[in-house]
Amino acid sequence: MAITRWFFSTNHKDIGTLYLVFGAWAGMVGTALSLLIRAELNQPGALLGDDQIYNVIVTAHAFVMIFFMVMPILIGGFGNWLVPLMIGAPHMAFPRMNNMSFWLLPPSFLLLLASSGVEAGAGTGWTVYPPLAGNLAHAGASVDLTIFSLHLAGVSSILGAINFITTTINMKPPALSQYQTPLFVWAVLITAVLLLLSLPVLAAGITMLLTDRNLNTTFFDPAGGGDPILYQHLFWFFGHPEVYILILPGFGIISHVVAYYAGKKEPFGYMGMVWAMMAIGLLGFIVWAHHMFTVGMDVDTRAYFTSATMIIAIPTGVKVFSWLATLHGGTIKWDTPMLWALGFIFLFTVGGLTGIVLSNSSLDIVLHDTYYVVAHFHYVLSMGAVFAIMAGFVHWFPLFTGFSLHDTWTKIHFGVMFIGVNLTFFPQHFLGLAGMPRRYSDYPDAYTLWNTVSSIGSLISLVAVIIFLFILWEAFASKRQVMSVELTMTNVEWLHGCPPPYHTFEEPAFVQVRSN
């Protein structure tokens, strides 16, 4: 196995594997950072000794989990592996650009780690708001390195997005209409469009911040006629679509897993599912200022952003009820991926409900920057995106490797993880309602109980991560071959066996469309 196979690969399966391995590794780093946060907050008083270090850890935790764990795994890993197989394409539209998209990520990660190592690190929060991110509050190269890291990750995602859009539209067999492609393909396509439209705005915002810091421009400095609120608008115009970028591929995975383990040929309401994802993608761009209810916007502006945000709950509800309808009347197989998918549906819905609470601008004035917000987005990310990743991984692991995971251990892993994340994040709702603010390393002792509970939960989640590593080792050590796969006619990615040959669909796929 020559090293060139991995460095110079143009094979969508190899690049998908690279993304999965990189994402898993980054996930370990992000988990370690989150445990440092929970260790600091386990009891009142200082552990790390310095608020700047604490904020650097919080910032790095967010960036690592978002840009180097969730996105590479969901879009780069599952997307690269499955999209060509699902539409019958021999490879991605731009195979060498695909390779570059991946290899931009390790240098980007390196720059992010470097930013923590120089000066005092970037303790700005993942939003990197000026004036805290300006050259007075953050003198030195830390924030600049973080900005360059984001630029690289952004370029990687934009190139990947171009590739996925071109592939899904252009590389299908002529007889296959876009409305006959699987839902995961749709999810990745819509995600790619969101990336393509939102990332350039982030690039503009952080480039302006870079020049404010180094070239004496005043885009965000009132002294020169600038406005720090402009940065917030630019950042959140990217930042809100970004959270839908993180969850949409997860929606696609859950649709596949639920239909498969309910024994159904297709998910309930295919067209409704597609339109719901389109609606979520569109609405995601016109609600960004709900992150800014406390900056002093007009009451009519707040009213608009409140109602627009609530509208997103409608297509999201369409998806949740369609998943439940897919389950209805099916012969349910209680395999591990199904457990993850059911956990996803329940916990994502809980996270969505707290989101509806926060969409009310009047309530958000009180809850903004408290742990209620932290609890909300960790329910949709730590139990939405991560549960979707686990569902997809356990479901498609036999396809990726040709080996099967240990049934009992994966169920134990699910149980431990389920308890861990809920114990970690459910108490944070109480802390938020009691007024505990985010991004502080210490707190009044009235908040001790729920912080301690939360930190114990994080240790349980750590045990789950270690169990997962053991499960991976066990699967590769035992080498249990995959016997047979059911429902291959409606799950075309499995048609070539486990694992599929290095090159699939070298000759164009023959597609017959049955109208029934």
Swiss-Prot record:
Binding-site list for Fe(II)-heme a: 61, 378
GO cellular component assignments: mitochondrial inner membrane; respiratory chain complex IV
Side Mitochondrial matrix, residues: 1-11, 87-94, 171-182, 262-269, 328-335, 401-406, 479-516
Chain residues that bind Mg(2+): 368-369
Disulphide linkage map: none
GO molecular function, one term: cytochrome-c oxidase activity
An example Gene Ontology biological process: electron transport coupled proton transport
Record-listed Cu cation binding positions: 240, 290-291
Top-level EC class: translocase
Segments in the Mitochondrial intermembrane topological domain: 41-50, 118-140, 213-227, 287-298, 358-370, 434-446
Alphabetical UniProt keywords: Calcium, Copper, Electron transport, Heme, Iron, Magnesium, Membrane, Metal-binding, Mitochondrion, Mitochondrion inner membrane, Respiratory chain, Sodium, Translocase, Transmembrane, Transmembrane helix, Transport
Positions bound to Na(+): 40, 45, 441
Main location group: mitochondrion
Cofactor(s) the record lists: heme; Cu cation
Source organism, top-level taxon: Eukaryota
Localisation per UniProt entry: Mitochondrion inner membrane
Reactions catalysed according to its record: 4 Fe(II)-[cytochrome c] + O2 + 8 H(+)(in) = 4 Fe(III)-[cytochrome c] + 2 H2O + 4 H(+)(out)
Transmembrane segments: 12-40, 51-86, 95-117, 141-170, 183-212, 228-261, 270-286, 299-327, 336-357, 371-400, 407-433, 447-478
Cofactor binding note of this UniProt entry: Binds 2 heme A groups non-covalently per subunit. Binds a copper B center.
Family named by the database record: Belongs to the heme-copper respiratory oxidase family.
Role of this protein: Component of the cytochrome c oxidase, the last enzyme in the mitochondrial electron transport chain which drives oxidative phosphorylation. The respiratory chain contains 3 multisubunit complexes succinate dehydrogenase (complex II, CII), ubiquinol-cytochrome c oxidoreductase (cytochrome b-c1 complex, complex III, CIII) and cytochrome c oxidase (complex IV, CIV), that cooperate to transfer electrons derived from NADH and succinate to molecular oxygen, creating an electrochemical gradient over the inner membrane that drives transmembrane transport and the ATP synthase.
Oligomer status and interactors: Component of the cytochrome c oxidase (complex IV, CIV), a multisubunit enzyme composed of 14 subunits. The complex is composed of a catalytic core of 3 subunits MT-CO1, MT-CO2 and MT-CO3, encoded in the mitochondrial DNA, and 11 supernumerary subunits COX4I, COX5A, COX5B, COX6A, COX6B, COX6C, COX7A, COX7B, COX7C, COX8 and NDUFA4, which are encoded in the nuclear genome.
Protein name: Cytochrome c oxidase subunit 1
Species name: Formosania lacustris
Gene: mt-co1
